[in-house]
Regions:
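Bacterial signal peptide processing site
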Residues: 21-24
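C-terminal motif of bacterial Sec signal peptides marking the signal peptidase cleavage site
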Residues: 16-19
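Positively charged n-region of N-terminal signal peptides that target proteins for export
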Residues: 1-11
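A residue-level marker of the well-folded mature domains of exported/periplasmic proteins
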Residues: 26-302
Length: 302
């Protein structure tokens, strides 16, 4: 049981940060690059920093809540004031994102973050028009090929915590077998995915590998909602998986819809982004979570 508790804690806390990748990455020994970075750091004092953030959602869904906590941690670490940070919530993956980015640049932001996969093309457009503003995009991949020195991508190695949370799930399945709750051939897991994108697929692959590392008989079924955050669709997907015989649920989707369904059905849940204990107090095992604070602090300091 102590081992199980330790893995629960590890699953909740494990994360690994990746540096913001520029489209013009320089070698470590490139003195001209180091010089430019030093000059840039000197030219922007803390009082001159103005940060813009474009969120896909708001504080009511876990993914955006995690980013908001990271921004607040950065603000505290760097001693920034409220008027040095401008946050825009509920910005969809369309032209609205470009308009939001332009507005932030016009308000004097010298670094702008966009948090959703579908924001990337609109941030690229804005970055080309505002070369003196740094644009950083979460979960994207086009910065390196864009030819823009002020466009960057960032994400974490969250597959690592997904693997560990999969181990937690596998141990729970073993416990259910030992207790006689299920048989070995009933170790079927359901996974609520947002979109059939590489990010989601790599995540559930890591999770499933973690499960199978301790429970080799486990199988898994995935249902996509085709939405990053829809409490109703995620709840319906979880209910469908449970009805199909899944005895444990996990997710790569941003709301508490799945955990609500699991609590009602008495089915264990491994969440994402934030703790699911509030909505599944008897069924939440752990969540694959990300602490964005260190990255946001690093990026703004840079």
């Amino acid at each position: 049981m102590k081992k199980f508790a330790a893995l629960l804690l590890a699953g909740a806390m494990a994360f690994s940060m990746m540096a913001c990748g520029s489209s013009s990455d320089k070698k470590a020994g490139d003195k001209s690059s180091d010089s430019k970075k030093t000059e840039s750091a000197k030219s922007t004092s803390a009082s001159d920093i103005k940060v813009g953030v474009i969120y896909i959602g708001d504080e009511n869904e876990g993914y955006t809540e995690a980013h908001m906590k990271g921004i607040q941690e950065m603000k505290k670490e760097l001693g920034l004031s409220d008027d040095q940070i401008i946050e825009k919530t509920l910005i969809p993956e369309d032209e609205t994102c470009y308009d939001a980015a332009v507005d932030l640049a016009e308000q004097g932001c010298n670094i702008i973050f966009g948090t959703s996969f579908g924001h990337e093309s609109y941030l690229l457009q804005a970055a080309a028009e505002y070369p003196d503003v740094q644009f950083c995009h979460a979960t994207g991949y086009q910065a390196a090929s864009s030819g823009l020195d002020n466009m960057h991508n960032y994400f974490t190695a969250v597959y690592e915590s997904r693997y560990v949370s999969g181990v937690v799930a596998g141990l729970k399945l073993n416990e259910m077998i030992e207790n006689g709750d299920i048989k070995e051939d009933q170790t079927k897991i359901g996974y609520v995915g947002a979109y059939p994108y590489a990010e989601v697929k790599s995540g559930y692959t890591a999770f499933f590998l973690g499960v199978r590392s301790v429970c080799p008989s486990a199988t898994m079924k995935v249902i996509y909602t085709n939405s990053w955050a829809s409490i109703d669709l995620e709840k319906e997907a979880a209910e469908s998986l449970i009805a199909d015989g899944c005895v444990l649920i996990s997710q790569h989707a941003d709301t508490t819809g799945a955990s609500t369904a699991c609590e009602k059905a008495g089915v264990p849940i491994v969440g994402y982004n934030v703790s699911m204990i509030a909505t599944a107090p008897t069924q939440a095992l752990t969540s694959a979570s990300i602490d964005w604070g260190p990255y946001y602090t690093y990026a703004v300091k840079s």
